[in-house]
Amino acid sequence: MAGFYRYDQNLDKYVPMPVELLASEGEEYTAPKITQKFNEVETKTTEILNKVLTDDRYFTVTSSFKQDATLGIEYYVTKVTPKTTEAKKSMVQKTFAYDFEKSIDPTSSYFGTTNRETVLSMAKRKRSVVAINASGWRSNGEVMGLQIKDGVLYKDYDAAGYTGAEACVFFDDGTMKVYGNREVDADILISKGARNSFAFGIWLVKDSKPRTAQMTTWADLNVKHPRQAIGQRSDGTLVIITVDGRSLRSSGITAYDMPSLFLSEGCINAFLLDGGGSSQTAVEGKYINNISDGIERAVVDTLTISYPDDDTDSRFFEVQEGRGLATSLNRRVEFIESKPTWNVLDLGFSPDGLIDNTAKFKKALSDLSEKGGGKLHFPKGTYLIGKQNTTSASEKIELPSNVSIVGERRSYTKLLRNPNHSLDELLRITDHNYIEGIEIDGNSSVNKSSCRLIAGGNIKSFKMKDCSLVNATDRGVSIHGIGKSITIEGMYISNIANECINVAEGEIIKLIDSEITFSGTALWVGNAANIFTKNNLAKSLKTFVRYKNSQNAICSGNIITNNIDRAIWGSVREAVFSDNVFKQCHSDYHLYFIQEDTGTNDLIVTGNSVYSDVEGTAFIRTPSDIDRRRVSGNVGNIPSLNLD
């Protein structure tokens, strides 16, 4: 069976989508060339989506990928056209994050918690066809501005004089209107039928006229960022525009340039929603835009588009094995036959940690390769692997393309390196490999020969999640060719002699939500683009991240403590380092940037907390000839916290 389904009301079951609506397995699309003609470039993937998402009974949904050479942006236009008056009235809904819906008293003067929820999670809870981030929120989780849900006032406008959070209001008849802060009192809006409201702003278009004044409410309005906004045509069609940003392909857009996009789409009203890393649009259970954080961001509320409550047809569906339309409607569409899942105990593997499983492992992988891929499931136990007493490359354990290995969880399932294994790699990866719930132990206390736990050459799409990498005599993961889309998530990494993750060259590299301790460098990247290190705990390392001739990096939310050397160093362009905690660096600087071959420029270093008892340690050193640097808003007890 294929991996893409829709509900068939006559058959009362989910059925595969017709093959002609989807690309063949492995088909890839390159981004179209940018043209000077405004608003005209669309990909073949767009055409596929337009066919998939049409439903003539309630509304139609189309999503288009576009480029604008003059503005230097890539963006997505999602249009929702109601087919009936009732659909126009009911299709827009407001969804608060979990805790808001469970515990908030709408009569209270304040509501906010640090708990938030992802756009996709809210979409799945509400079975929404389209879901987008909406209102802005403060660091304590308090939602901004006027908040009306289902005709009930949850929160009034922000204090008089605070003009940032304006209002986008949907009325009982489905009409969308936009207002400045406190332009119309909340009780008057509700008396006129206000049903749901969203707050951020500014409004961009009102009564078919673009905003030309009071565009300085917030300083960032005239700065290029990823942006999310919504508009409405006179016929009730909603137009959602999501602009990518903070990347080589798309620089982002200012608020000043947004009205023209909506006027070109025929909108009579338009409103700027929360943007930046919060800019996220999910259509039929998948994000269609490139999220600038590299991972989805939890938010306080969403604007969702759903079918009527009594309808069971054409709702969004679960995509089998995480496949189907790609997370960006831009690059790749897959149509995949179901792959087998084999329990290794059924194949004669021994989980006692004493008997070598190398031959059986290689045989199982070879058989899965002949079937086009699949999954090996490792129940609880310790599995000894690694050919002993040989240096022959043919004896390496290689995961074929489209093969996954999955354990019970990392504290239950272990792959243990043989004491007499002498090859320089324990596992070799190829394209589209996935490893989850397994501890991979290099057995360095017994086997002293140099060995990388996982290695590969030119790799497309490799992910490790909820695994452990421990006791390696060399690197943890080593990509010595070009690595594209490498994700290391939710890991425990310890006692790795050299780099925990090393990518010689590549793009879209993520180290997120992991704990890394007592090792060399957590992440080493060279000639790489789009590098994300977020929400990691790094303790007692040599270095957290070493960049070499890299660009487009986001490093945020990490706690980095007790490094032997500098926490972050190297050469990187167009990088943001924010909201990290740096403690006890045993070197001259926590952050140390150099020029190397391609140089260091366009750095933003802000919102970090920096503390050290080591005498002589400063926060940051940048090259004297750096272009565009902002080091501000940092706190701590050492010199050079704020250079600008």
Curated annotation (Swiss-Prot):
Signal sequence, start to end: none
Coiled-coil segments: none
Lineage of producing organism: Bacteria, Bacillati, Bacillota, Bacilli, Bacillales
Pfam families: NAGPA, Pect-lyase_RHGA_epim
Protein name: SPbeta prophage-derived uncharacterized protein YomE
Organism: Bacillus subtilis (strain 168)
Domain of life (superkingdom): Bacteria
